[in-house]
């Protein structure tokens, strides 16, 4: 704990006279005991804060489940819900066995960790069980992102394989590069050993979590191909509407709530005073991070609302929800190191990026039921670039440790080195995830383990794979959920049963 009490006989000699040594030993011993109590209390408070943040991040799994369920057709609800449960369950086991060691095991050459497999020799002087739990919650978030991209057409065994591989190997390697003190691009390395003298700044994971999940989903959806009926023979897009906007909104609010553990919780400690003043410390940085997260998401939501209104002619709640989440995904990298006004810029541009990526996806006939690759991959990449433009020198030194001459945001007068490091991060994440997850999805396809049959896809996986529908009554998915691109109304005039 900073500001520890110090005491010695020499300090007290002028006050205690002839008996200075004996009295000083006693007094210093008592003060040492008090100091240890304060240190223990600070450690307990920091761990409690981290555990609370881990619980919030884990609650995002419920948000992902609701968002996914509402975004697919009713006939595939049980399937997508089960995959979300297994993302957490399989991810928990594989992150325990391998993932944490690869990510934070230490003693590496900058590429991958080599210790603490199955939490052996754990806890360590630098990490307790609360840190493992927090990082596991992050790992399964990446897997949850990917599941949305390949929804409604993927074999169940493929989910198990890709989720285990992603959380046990692919994601941990990336998190080691940028978050471990040993990582080759980490900002926590010694000053003279950092990438471009700064390291890549990805505070809570626009790249490490969102881009990894989004790029993995991109390859899965590309290799599988679009859902049946998503595009007509002439290339005209047909929107396959999700069956419940209510679940989408519920999932969005749960994710919003969890993001206050995702971003502010990434400080991992709260009782860290800064040198700027006794009443100013990490608790202030945590508050600023929460405010920046809020402003970016809100700005992206409103920008998407009016942008989509101009493009489609109607107000669409699911588009607004995706815009909100895109703003959150983008600010995640720089939430701790930018001013609140910059977070508004981040959210505005995140909405523009998301809308643009969705237009491009339609042009190339790319089908992603939850827009996960566009939202998490595209907005995550923008978030990394945003840091290179708007990161503030003062906040970088507070969050990552004071370093004379540390590069900071280009638009803030800090030169282009940080932006260069951010671009390198984007490139290596795209390359690594493409090489690993793209190869895995290709192998699964060649082994006929990736996509379900056309008959099962048309009938719905709930009936053909999971023993029955999620609801006693459900809509006729093939008709009522097919929507002309320019209309908010389904083709079928038959009202849905409830």
From Swiss-Prot:
Give the matching Gene3D superfamilies.
Ammonium transporter AmtB like domains
Regarding tissue, the record states:
Highly expressed in roots. Expressed in root tips, root hairs, root epidermis, rhizodermis and cortex.
Q: Which residues carry this modification: Phosphoserine?
A: 487
What keywords were assigned to this record? Answer: Ammonia transport, Cell membrane, Membrane, Phosphoprotein, Transmembrane, Transmembrane helix, Transport
Q: Does the keyword Transport apply?
A: yes
What's the short name of a Pfam family annotated to this entry? Ammonium_transp
Q: Which residues carry this modification: Phosphothreonine?
A: 464
Highest taxon above the source species: Eukaryota
Region called Disordered, residue ranges? 479-498
Q: How does it sit in the membrane?
A: Multi-pass membrane protein
Q: Which residues cross the membrane?
A: 50-70, 85-105, 131-151, 156-176, 203-223, 247-267, 315-335, 337-357, 370-390, 423-443
This chain's function reads: Ammonium transporter probably involved in ammonium uptake from the soil. Contributes with AMT1-1 to the overall ammonium uptake capacity in roots under nitrogen-deficiency conditions.
Regarding protein family, the annotation reads: Belongs to the ammonia transporter channel (TC 1.A.11.2) family.
Q: What is this protein called?
A: Ammonium transporter 1 member 3
